[in-house]
Amino acid sequence: MASLIEKLLRTGDKKTLRQLRNYADSINALESSFQTFTDAELREETDRLRERHQDGEKLDDLLPEAFAAVREASSRTLGMRHFDVQLMGGAALHLGNIAEMKTGEGKTLVATAPAYLNALTGNGVHVITVNDYLAEYQSDLMGRVYRFLGLTSGCILSNQDPAVRREQYAADITYGTNNEFGFDYLRDNMAWDKSELVQRGHHFAIVDEVDSILIDEARTPLIISGPAQGDTNRWYSEFAKVVTRLKPDEDYEVDEKKRTVGVLEGGIEKVEDYLGIHNLYESANTPLIGFLNNAIKAKELFKRDKDYVILDGEVLIVDEHTGRILAGRRYNEGMHQAIEAKEGVEIKAENQTLATVTLQNYFRMYNKLSGMTGTAETEAAEFMSTYKLGVVAIPTNRDMQRIDQPDLVYKNEAVKFDAVVKDIAERHEKGQPVLVGTTSVEKSEYLSRLLAKEGIRHEVLNAKNHAREAAIVAQAGRKGAVTVATNMAGRGTDIMLGGNAEFTAVAELAAKGLDPEENSEEYEAAWPAAFEAAKQAVKDEHEEVLELGGLYVLGTERHESRRIDNQLRGRSGRQGDPGESRFYLSLTDDLMRLFNSGAAERLMNSSVPDDVALESKLVSRAIASAQGQVEGRNAEQRKNVLKYDDVLNRQREAIYGDRRRILEGDDLHEKVQFFLEDTITALIDAATSEGTGDDWDFNQLWTNLKTLYPVSVTSHDVIDEAGGKSRITVDFLKEEILSDARLVYQAREQAIGSESMRELERRVVLSVIGRKWQEHLYEMDYLKEGIGLRAMAQRDPLVEYQREGFIMFQAMMEAIREESVGFLFNLEVEVTPAEDVVVADGAGEHTEHHEPQIHAAGLEAPEKPAQLQYTAPGEDGASQTRVEGRSSGRSGNPAKAAQDGARKPAPKKKKR
């Protein structure tokens, strides 16, 4: 049924393809006339198209001419002419779809035409890639096309300072990773001044490897966190003791597969008895549930000397794939502290969420979203339901000739790898290039040792050094090449039979000291000859490898996602080349062991010898079933993350919208008057909720009012004015006190000046919003941590989260209003008045207006925490954390890396 829904949701039907084909025909009809343009005339086409758009013409109508201009510019600068299917893919992107294009169809070039067309609006286009290396490489290469047409391109890289980032965002087209774009959005919404903002809106995004970014990585939200306030360490120690008294299956359940725990009724009673509390589910006790869950996870799911080690009294995480210690990394959401408490070492400060957003909600902010991938069909339903994105299957430029062989299944892993090595050796001996895909670094290194023992030269790629690995992958199609790679390694780089001419030419020019940005004219002059020489160099070898059967792709294990299996296969058979693929499996592979142990066990007990491969429908069905289970679980996880973030997203949009308007200079006078009215009304309502004037405690009410503002009218004055307590009404009381508060506010404004008062209002409200929002995020984190247990009380956790989250948000907004009013009345303020200053310079004298300067305790920009943690999905979708100042790596010059096999720090990018 799911596949039927997926087919129905795919928009790549005859009608859509006919529309795209018509666009391609229109562009082709213009090609000969565009070829007659001089370089200057082609550049002027950009100005003409921009003016026509400003005069009201729609981008859809400008598409044929814009795409024709890009095709011609690309031919002249890169020596690459867009195929018709690449133009169709570009049109699909412009229309806000996902273009499903097979590996090797030139997706990087596809993005140039829609990026150029949409950049004509002046609003900026974002092109999102999976890592820094690809962002920089594509920006450098495709930036040559944009510059030729008079546009600028930028690139966002980790560790760039805000001034550089702002410059890159100001470009017409900006490249970068999903994490960098997302973190910039969050940092902009933590800014204290308009000058700190770097982004300029979310208009049009093209997401490369869209299934990886919008599906695989969407399970992990982006989080910026800093040291938490208050003492929570006591609770970690307390709960570490509590859980030693609890027994698995009796007091709690553990699911190792999902890495989750659930507390049973008996366990809850023991915890309540130990802590001396009546009900763990009461809202006041909500934070305790998170401590309990983490303590059980630390006890059952995190094993010493496997998941972590203790060195010098410190808990250090061990990489599950490499066995290496990950210095500086800490588990988030209190997990690291729970392990420290369990081990009895010093508990280091917990981090508090300062800003967070899911990738789903970040990308849904774009006015228009599009994407490219070779494998979107299996997720078409999710793309439509989450992002309202249709999937358009673009035909290949040439017919596919790859042969996909049936899987070979062995009883155990050792025998499987023996067969793998034998197959590689046979192919290598005759010179056929081989690409071997593994699911982990550990398996890559194991296979590497086996190959070395047999004397087979090979390269191992583990997605650690993107620049160096792209250089190796680019040459993985050469005769006799053997390349072992994890699924994530070397993405975005074409494996061309005989070698990658484009990559060779880039490396050649870099070796001569030429840079496409720094030496633009020399570079463009040298490119045609370098590219032609590189093409000639690989031509003969290309023919030889074709004769040998093309690239052979060998998978050593099925991945938990069908898409990633298909991506690996797709590395072979590009652009109509011959190719072959096969998967070698064992019944002890993780996928079979965890998700279809029954089928695996039946086959294990069969009489087939260990070293004989099994080929059976039962195996195929077991694999399909296991992959279906994992995909279903992951989809449910993403859906769950999104449901909960949708609750927070509505609140985030409201708060971030207010912050942005304040930063941009909104006049808050009316809003502050509403704050004043609302706060005083709430105080009076609370004091007069029962009885009549004779029953009300006027002394207490006046005490409360004095904490808010310097009241100038006494309770006796108001009572006398009303004609006694018995005759006073709530409305009269509100009218009198509000009138007094407004007079006091006016007097304060006269004392410091209207302009200064407006600035004070902005600074106070911004400061209070910032502090209260962080407190709110902290409370929402704790609410979410314990909300799952509401299911035991027969309540829907999501509904409970929505309900309590709304109540907490209302309470936060009330606190923002009350604190803002209190500060505005009571802050001691020093004001340097506004003044007009005459300035003399070379052009003569002119007058500059200097805004009033306000100084008050607590109103300066808050001090930035010494360390900020950035948590985001890695390329495998798993959560990874880096501490600011120690980046997870920054890409280097790709061609230089190709030349010397090492990545160097990238220079600061310039707007171009």
UniProtKB/Swiss-Prot annotation:
The record's catalysed reaction(s) read: ATP + H2O + cellular proteinSide 1 = ADP + phosphate + cellular proteinSide 2
Q: Where does ATP bind?
A: 86, 104-108, 494
Coiled-coil residues are: none
Q: Which domain of life is it from?
A: Bacteria
Chaperone: is it a keyword of this entry?
A: no
GO terms of biological process kind:
intracellular protein transmembrane transport; protein import; protein targeting; protein transport by the Sec complex
Q: What is its EC number?
A: 7.4.2.8
A single GO cellular-component term from the record reads:
plasma membrane
Chain segments carrying region Disordered: 860-912
Query: What SUPFAM superfamilies does the entry give?
Result: Helical scaffold and wing domains of SecA, P-loop containing nucleoside triphosphate hydrolases, Pre-protein crosslinking domain of SecA
What is the top EC class of this enzyme, as a single word? Answer: translocase
Please provide the record's keywords in A-Z order. ATP-binding, Cell membrane, Cytoplasm, Membrane, Nucleotide-binding, Protein transport, Translocase, Translocation, Transport
Picking any one GO molecular function of the record gives: protein-exporting ATPase activity
Q: Does the keyword Endoplasmic reticulum apply?
A: no
Its record classes its membrane topology as: Peripheral membrane protein
Q: Where in the cell is it found?
A: Cell membrane; Cytoplasm
Q: Which family does it belong to?
A: Belongs to the SecA family.
Q: Which HAMAP family does the protein's record reference?
A: SecA (MF_01382)
Alphabetized PANTHER family for the sequence: CHLOROPLAST PROTEIN-TRANSPORTING ATPASE (PTHR30612:SF0), SECA INNER MEMBRANE COMPONENT OF SEC PROTEIN SECRETION SYSTEM (PTHR30612)
Function, as annotated: Part of the Sec protein translocase complex. Interacts with the SecYEG preprotein conducting channel. Has a central role in coupling the hydrolysis of ATP to the transfer of proteins into and across the cell membrane, serving as an ATP-driven molecular motor driving the stepwise translocation of polypeptide chains across the membrane.
Describe the subunit structure: Monomer and homodimer. Part of the essential Sec protein translocation apparatus which comprises SecA, SecYEG and auxiliary proteins SecDF. Other proteins may also be involved.
Q: What is this protein called?
A: Protein translocase subunit SecA
Species of origin: Arthrobacter sp. (strain FB24)
Identify the coding gene: secA
